[in-house]
């Protein structure tokens, strides 16, 4: 199992390593170029001295050249050795008696410029042949690289020290900066744990100096609001469903008890109890079907077969059927002169019409006059269904699409409603890209305005 690390320590470690590596590479590159430049300078200085010695032998004979003449051509930390053709050392002199070069020279295969190490010190050695009127031999210039090596070593030490100091500073700054970044995250984590303990009523009420964390806080609060709303709806749904199921089950239980006591001997009691029980079972079945319909999501809607439905024809068909079933009701229709096509599942549209018309009939038992209007307006299909019944109080308008909500609770059961019809209708409208508006005045009228976008 991978051990989890704190974000601020991980951030500090990563930034410190990157900084140290970058500085180290930068210093190494600089040292590389400095070494090359300094080494070229050392070689140039040694070659100048070697050339001066060669010119001295060309201008004077060996017997006229003194050690002082040779030393005048040398720089500090240089030594000159003169050999004859047989490799015998004739002259050895320098301006610095501390030089400790005593390596042998291979005159059979001499390298003009090479580096040799003697007594722990590197030397640049330049071997030049000397050909003059009275002398033939070799000059060997020994140039100490001790200062060069010490300088390069110092550069490495300075680079390492600079890298370490920069790393320590970076680590400190990184720690402070990462602490500032992770502080709101830690606060959010603590708040989330508090919300987990105390419930959804708490929200993250803090702001930071960073847009990303502020957006995260806003998103979290929005998510918590949706979760709380969903949780409350679920709890209300369970409570309401339990309440709605309790009454028919109690009725069925009561009539079964009647059958058990007297129904076996009294056919009238048996018949009445069975009819009422069947009616309540049908009510429960309808309630369960409506609950299942409400739990279906948009994915289920997408797999439904949609077709171009003639809105006016469907309304006329539904009105004709209802007119036969309810001859005491008057259905007034004002339909658009042009055909109106709506892409929707036909069964859903039929169910939508039945819900609104049935709802209008339930709450208009006095005038029994239902008005249906269709029109095309602003690229929208408008369907208005109006009844002249009891109306809806303004305080109830925002709740009428909630599950199990009834405006007239005393009459709802006798009218056979479960309080789910408008919730189902709203869902059908929303799933098909439409919207619903309600206008109502108490004891006068209620109009449901359903609108859908026109097909392209």
Swiss-Prot record:
<keyword id="KW-0597">Phosphoprotein</keyword>
<keyword id="KW-0418">Kinase</keyword>
<protein>
    <recommendedName>
        <fullName>Signal transduction histidine-protein kinase ArlS</fullName>
        <ecNumber>2.7.13.3</ecNumber>
    </recommendedName>
</protein>
<keyword id="KW-0547">Nucleotide-binding</keyword>
<feature type="transmembrane region" description="Helical">
    <location>
        <begin position="13"/>
        <end position="33"/>
    </location>
</feature>
<feature type="domain" description="HAMP">
    <location>
        <begin position="179"/>
        <end position="232"/>
    </location>
</feature>
<feature type="transmembrane region" description="Helical">
    <location>
        <begin position="157"/>
        <end position="177"/>
    </location>
</feature>
<comment type="function">
    <text>Member of the two-component regulatory system ArlS/ArlR. ArlS probably functions as a sensor protein kinase which is autophosphorylated at a histidine residue and transfers its phosphate group to ArlR.</text>
</comment>
<dbReference type="GO" id="GO:0005886">
    <property type="term" value="C:plasma membrane"/>
</dbReference>
<dbReference type="InterPro" id="IPR050398">
    <property type="entry name" value="Bact_Sensor_His_Kinase"/>
</dbReference>
<dbReference type="Pfam" id="PF00512">
    <property type="entry name" value="HisKA"/>
</dbReference>
<feature type="domain" description="Histidine kinase">
    <location>
        <begin position="240"/>
        <end position="456"/>
    </location>
</feature>
<dbReference type="Pfam" id="PF18719">
    <property type="entry name" value="ArlS_N"/>
</dbReference>
<dbReference type="GO" id="GO:0005524">
    <property type="term" value="F:ATP binding"/>
</dbReference>
<dbReference type="InterPro" id="IPR004358">
    <property type="entry name" value="Sig_transdc_His_kin-like_C"/>
</dbReference>
<keyword id="KW-0812">Transmembrane</keyword>
<dbReference type="GO" id="GO:0000155">
    <property type="term" value="F:phosphorelay sensor kinase activity"/>
</dbReference>
<keyword id="KW-0067">ATP-binding</keyword>
<keyword id="KW-0902">Two-component regulatory system</keyword>
<dbReference type="InterPro" id="IPR041610">
    <property type="entry name" value="ArlS_N"/>
</dbReference>
<dbReference type="Pfam" id="PF02518">
    <property type="entry name" value="HATPase_c"/>
</dbReference>
<dbReference type="InterPro" id="IPR003661">
    <property type="entry name" value="HisK_dim/P_dom"/>
</dbReference>
<feature type="modified residue" description="Phosphohistidine; by autocatalysis">
    <location>
        <position position="243"/>
    </location>
</feature>
<dbReference type="InterPro" id="IPR036890">
    <property type="entry name" value="HATPase_C_sf"/>
</dbReference>
<keyword id="KW-1133">Transmembrane helix</keyword>
<keyword id="KW-0808">Transferase</keyword>
<dbReference type="InterPro" id="IPR005467">
    <property type="entry name" value="His_kinase_dom"/>
</dbReference>
<keyword id="KW-0472">Membrane</keyword>
<keyword id="KW-1003">Cell membrane</keyword>
<dbReference type="InterPro" id="IPR003660">
    <property type="entry name" value="HAMP_dom"/>
</dbReference>
<dbReference type="InterPro" id="IPR036097">
    <property type="entry name" value="HisK_dim/P_sf"/>
</dbReference>
